Amino acid sequence: MKLMTKQIEKAARKQYNLGSDLDQNVVAKFFDPCGSWSWFVMNQDPDNPEYLWGIIKGFEVEQGSFSLSELQNYRGRLGLGIERDISFRPQPARGILHMLLEGKHV
């Protein structure tokens, strides 16, 4: 499965100038189907599309950058890679962060 579609790239690059500001949308959700990690994409640098910025739910919930190629190349248990949640629709980043910090599923 392709993680970044043209539509997601366009939306993420459009928000690049917002940086880590939570007053923007999360435009995509990636997840490990064999684990509990999730990555919520907020923006992407148009000049360096390798790196994405967003919210990461791993051992803890945090904001930060993550590598698109690392996500694309990762193979976990059972040989499965990171997937994109195809039912996810853009949502305000602030709301997603608060839900995750409260232990809710997004």
Region spans (language model):
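Catalytic phosphate/metal-binding cores of nucleic-acid and nucleotide-processing enzymes, i.e., regions
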Residues: 1-106
